[in-house]
Regions:
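Extreme N-terminal tail/first-helix region
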Residues: 1-19
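Short beta-strand segments
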Residues: 21-58
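A generic structural signal for nonpolar/aromatic side chains embedded in well-ordered alpha-helices
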Residues: 18, 65-66, 120
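Short, structured beta-strand-loop surface elements
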Residues: 59-116
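Short, structured loop/turn "capping" segments at alpha-beta junctions
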Residues: 126-131
Length: 146
């Protein structure tokens, strides 16, 4: 990051940004072409180690791209605020963001899918759902771990 004084490195500050975001942009690269898709997510954070969970269909472009190249980029942003000025060039925009890289893998084990779906639902709704409240057909769809 060019402006080091603005870099967020403290785990609690990173967690605050993640908590405020409900959408993450997931970026892939294939044969020189970039593909970015917004997705809902859940997460787990232990110390400085962040794991993202994304639910998706069992087939499609995301799954195909992960199978070809598991390297991904992520971006999420929140706390948007326009800073007004008297002149056009005095305007600015404030926001908090998280940008990173990782390796995506497709989760195969049903029990891991259920755990990850629980993380997604907890992050998106603020509620903890019992396993019995999960649709078995949805559990069998793909889940991505980053």
């Amino acid at each position: 990051m060019r402006r080091r004084e603005r870099e967020v490195v403290e785990p609690n500050e990173i967690r605050d940004i993640i908590e405020a975001c409900k959408v993450c942009r997931l970026g892939f690269c294939e044969e020189g072409e970039v593909y970015i898709v917004p997705v809902n997510f859940g997460y787990d954070m232990k110390g400085k180690e962040l794991t993202l969970y994304i639910h998706c269909a069992g087939e499609g472009r995301k799954i195909d791209l992960i199978r070809k190249n598991a390297k991904v980029g992520i971006e999420m942003d929140c706390h948007h605020e326009l800073a007004e000025g008297d002149l056009a060039c005095q305007y600015s925009y404030y926001y908090a963001s998280l940008i990173g890289n990782g390796h995506a893998k497709i989760v195969e084990e049903t029990y891991k899918k259920k755990e990850a779906l629980g993380k997604i639902m907890e992050h998106q709704t603020g509620k903890i759902f019992d396993e019995s409240e999960m649709n078995p057909k949805l559990v069998e769809l793909s889940l991505i771990h980053i």
